[in-house]
Structures are given as C-alpha cells and as structure tokens.
C-alpha cells in the first residue's frame, strides 16, 4: 500500500484553509489520491519526495474546485500522475 509523509496541516495549506472543518474530507481525499496513483502503476513514493507532494496539491485543488478552476487542476494532476507512473523511481516494487 502506498503511503505519503504529509500532515493534515500541510494539506490544509495546499488548499489554503486554516480551519479544521474539512480535515476528515482531506484525509479521505489523500487516500483516494494514493489509490489513484496505485491504479496508475505507482508502487512506491520516495521519502520526502517533492513531486508527490506537488501532485497531491494538484489533486486536492482539483477535487475541492479551488478558485473555480477544477479543470485546470485536473489536467495538471493527470499529467503529473502520468509522469510519476512512467518514472522508474515510482514504479519499483518495494521490498518488505
């Protein structure tokens, strides 16, 4: 199962909110993001990987329709996801 090292505070910052009312939703969106990456062939996320954090930000902004620009964020997210799925550092199966 994929994991990403990101706090709820970081996710709030990604969508530029400071309240806690959306914390549960942000947590669910994070899990949906990881599932989407996994279904696209991403098998591992390196520790402290900035591309995966930037891609998560795009995903959250798409799903939350940030500034009414969901289409723009969806296209950017899909492009980043494809890049990750094609890169060897994300497709290697982690050893347990």
Sequence positions of predicted segments:
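Short loop/turn elements at secondary-structure junctions
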Residues: 14, 20-22, 29, 47-96
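Short, intrinsically disordered N-terminal pre-domain segments
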Residues: 1-15
């Amino acid at each position: 199962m994929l994991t990403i090292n990101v706090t709820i505070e970081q996710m709030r910052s990604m969508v530029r909110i400071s309240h806690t009312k959306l914390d549960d939703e942000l947590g669910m969106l994070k899990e949906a993001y990881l599932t989407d990456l996994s279904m696209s062939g991403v098998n591992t996320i390196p520790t402290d990987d900035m591309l995966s954090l930037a891609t998560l930000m795009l995903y959250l902004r798409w799903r939350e329709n940030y500034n009414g620009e969901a289409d723009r964020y969806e296209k950017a997210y899909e492009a980043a996801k494809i890049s990750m799925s094609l890169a060897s550092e994300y497709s290697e199966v982690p050893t347990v």
